Amino acid sequence: WDDMEKIWHHTFYNELRVAPEELPVLLTEAPLNPKANREKMTQIMFETFNMPAMYVAIQAVLSLYASGRTTGIVMDSGDGVSHGVPVYEGYALPHAIVRLDLAGRELTNYLMKILTERGYSFTTTAEREIVRDIKEKLCYEALDFEQEMSTAAASTSLEKSYELPDGQVITIGNERFRCPEALFQPSFLGMEACGIHETTYNSIMKCDVDIRKDLYANTVMSGGTTMYPGIADRMQKEITALAPSTIKIKIIAPPERKYSVWIGGSILASLSTFQQMW
């Protein structure tokens, strides 16, 4: 918590350059964040920073607001964890939230591993940052993994080059889509978990049968780990295969989804009806 306090202090005084005691603050929390954490956040805001008012919102709900919806299911995937979060009329449904311990960090580690198999060595934390950059710039989600693998084997059309900080140029081929494939096939990482498509589906299935149709038709992707090109089409394909054939499925993947939690927070805090909620 001391570290968290330092980050907030830095944000208020060095980055925003505001007096926290003059402005209300909207904080966001992960789904299923324990009550004790929320109480501690509140205590620090009021006692350390003398905030006049505050509100704590669930991240996935804000992402949904950012897409202009109040009902839907959010597949939120960041660096450390992914969640399927169903939201009905602005409220997250805690009993149906499904957590998946697979996100950006695991994908970066996996890319480090498969690049090592190609003969490139990345081990230090600095090199790990380079691999993260390669991941963010060159990786994409294959619509059909097996087909993409045979395309990659037959030609060099999928190969891209990347210049390392020291000027060395490396070539990356099927790793470009093998890395994010782990989101749909966690077995690549030696994990027994379900992929993000099944996690989303399982979350929908934990909801009341009457609202499932609305969730399928409003499936919103959010967070940095959903930024791979092709991920929405792949998600559409995978969920269509799991869902009843008569159901309309719509995957919403806004271009600004890396920051949709922040955007949703900004929308919420500016609503006139919200002002009495602080």
UniProtKB/Swiss-Prot annotation:
A UniProt-annotated Pfam family: Actin
GO molecular-function term, one example from the UniProt record: hydrolase activity
Reaction(s) catalysed (UniProt annotation): ATP + H2O = ADP + phosphate + H(+)
PROSITE patterns assigned to the protein according to its UniProt record, in alphabetical order: ACTINS_ACT_LIKE
Domain of life, per lineage: Eukaryota
Entry's localization field: Cytoplasm, Cytoskeleton
Enzyme Commission number: 3.6.4.-
Chief location bin: cytoplasm
Gene3D superfamilies the UniProt entry points to: 3.30.420.40, Actin, Chain A, domain 4
Listed InterPro entries: Actin (IPR004000), Actin/actin-like_CS (IPR020902), ATPase_NBD (IPR043129)
GO cellular component, one term: cytoplasm
SUPFAM superfamilies for this protein: Actin-like ATPase domain
Keywords: ATP-binding, Cytoplasm, Cytoskeleton, Hydrolase, Nucleotide-binding
Family: Belongs to the actin family.
Its job: Actins are highly conserved proteins that are involved in various types of cell motility and are ubiquitously expressed in all eukaryotic cells.
Protein name according to UniProt: Actin
Organism from which the protein derives: Calanus finmarchicus (Calanus tonsus)
